[in-house]
């Protein structure tokens, strides 16, 4: 069959093609609901599927969904009711043993990604006409003047006017259309496992334990419902390489020997294996657009460098991408000039805070005395409130 010329090429099958059905992709699809656009959402996995993560769902993520549609937030709570723990407090322990408890006013919860992501995708099924293609890994992505073309591992190519890359830290879309070298100074690695029978852990409290030997990181203990705990340890990749750290070994050692954790884990049972994951940190200059493409969430390196969470940034950036997708499709303009406002919008909404959090993280990691000073200051309520605002 002869190759079609550009003039004779058929129009793209879809208006918007979203790669990745996690929080960023699902939020983008939800925000495109009712737009009249032909939207397809593809993912390499079949849901429900596990995703290695800390499982914390911060309040800004829930606020963003509620602003989009209050019904979404209410239904999400109902769908995750059997697999979540509402959080009221974060308990932080310094390397020297000081402790601070921060009580949160806005709703937040912990929920295994196996269930949370599945619930978000269920909202997409209920409330939009999005075509959802699961079990659809992609081999290649290319952009031309007229369309973007995604080649699945099996089946026919998918074409669209605009591509939204929401396919995570190891994004195929970003790697092929907006390649960026790994910068270990702006990347964290972590391991996590699930445990049962963990002692002295209030159901509404998440624990963060900072270590003297590994300052650009922390150990966490998060209840996720049903007596299950997400337990992990992560740190800056630059320090991992320099110190030759084995994260799994450190996690086991900390749980066995740390004075705050060892008594609580003496009778604990690990469920399944320890798994690792990477976290591309926000606050840098990584591109958020590529030819006919917008990047969201972890694919755009939007993880909070100070706190390590990324679901809120993923959902917010997915919604912003949908807003700009509507504009581009309405104007039939997918030029770099038309896509640039998306990057500027993400920078205004998220980038400035992420940049501040990155430099705070670096400062605290290199100045141990400052960490202890912050814990001391946090004993006083006015200073504690100021620190909470500073850290977002």
Language-model features and meaning:
Residues 323-392:
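C-terminal helical "tail/cap" subdomain of flavin- and related membrane-associated enzymes
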Residues 140, 157, 239-321, 328:
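FAD/FMN-dependent oxidoreductases across multiple families
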Residues 33-53:
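Glycine-rich FAD pyrophosphate-binding loop
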